[in-house]
Amino acid sequence: MAPLNTIESPRSPVKRILVLSYSQTGQLAQIVQSIVAPLQQSSDCAVHIETLQPVAPYPFPWRFFSFLDAFPESAHLVAPPLHPLSLTGDEDFDLVIVPYQVWFLAPSLPITAFLQHPTARKLLAGKPVVTVIACRNMWMLAQDKMKGLLTACGARLLDNVALVDPSPTMTTLFTTPLWLLSGKRDFLPGLPAAGVDAASIQAASRFGCALRDALHHDQERGSAPLLTGLKAADSDPSLLFSEKAATRSFYLWGKLLRAVGGPGQLRRRPFLFLYVVFLITLILTIVPLSLLVQTLLRPLLQRKFAALKQKFDAPSGSGIERMSVYEQ
């Protein structure tokens, strides 16, 4: 467990926390509420939730071509305009919580839009940030992109929480898109419901409790993570090859599609359909093949996987040594 990060100095009587909010399916909002509830219930904390609203809203359930049409801009971090924020940038927050969904192995476009907004640079400069991810199971390269966006704002990333769908990878390749396109988590009978499970959402309150306690001791002013020992981020390096292949695919095809036309333009559709064929082929061949090869080579790759896991678990880690302190 990381050492306490308390700095001896006069405390402000109330800690101000900024929480960004954009949840297309509603599940990320549930996770955020679970985390934020202990902070809202504390008399020592004042929580401001800033709901992000794209000028052109993203539907849920997503229509098929609208879903595909989001990937070129997602892959290239080309964000849409947002409705005006309620913040001016002159506000002073002690901690910023940035929850986000993973869209096409990148942060969701509304969150990207906020982080590229001039107001975000004013708000986040020098501020400690906790990121919270809710996704299928591939988030490592999206978090790398998030780190770049936060660095551009001058923010200090203290912690990362990643909550994922517990179902097998090949199962979620079907259940997650069907959820997004149908609006039903259990669209296919006999398969597990898509998304983060209810128990994990409820248990996420431990992060809010730990943040509350850390804020009480001014630990956010230092550089050490606040959520160690709480199994905040348990990465799976065996998925990294698939993430890299898909990220490169999204980027290259996204570049082509952006050259063909802008978001929503009909002339993109033939190329989007062509990409679907390519993507399905990729999913049915490269993904299972890479998982099989890595399983066979796991004894030879143990050291490499251990190093990758340590890298992507950071800064909060996957240890469980403090879990008993915050069990509900």
Predicted regions and their residues:
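N-terminal beta1-alpha1-beta2 submodule of the flavodoxin-like/Rossmannoid cofactor-binding fold
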Residues: 2-99, 105-110, 116, 211-328
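Short aromatic-enriched loop/helix-cap "lid" or pocket-rim segments at secondary-structure transitions
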Residues: 59-64, 143-144, 169-175
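A polyampholytic, Gly/Pro-enriched intrinsically disordered region
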Residues: 71-73, 149-156, 176-188
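Internal, well-ordered alpha/beta segment that forms a basic, Gly-enriched binding/recognition surface
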Residues: 84, 102, 137, 141
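Glycine-rich, phosphate-binding/catalytic loops in enzymes
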Residues: 112-116, 146-149
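Short, conserved loop/helix-junction motifs that constitute active-site signature segments
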Residues: 120-126
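Short, glycine-/small-residue-rich phosphate/pyrophosphate-handling segment
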Residues: 128-170
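Glycine-rich phosphate/pyrophosphate-binding loop and the adjoining helix
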Residues: 168-246
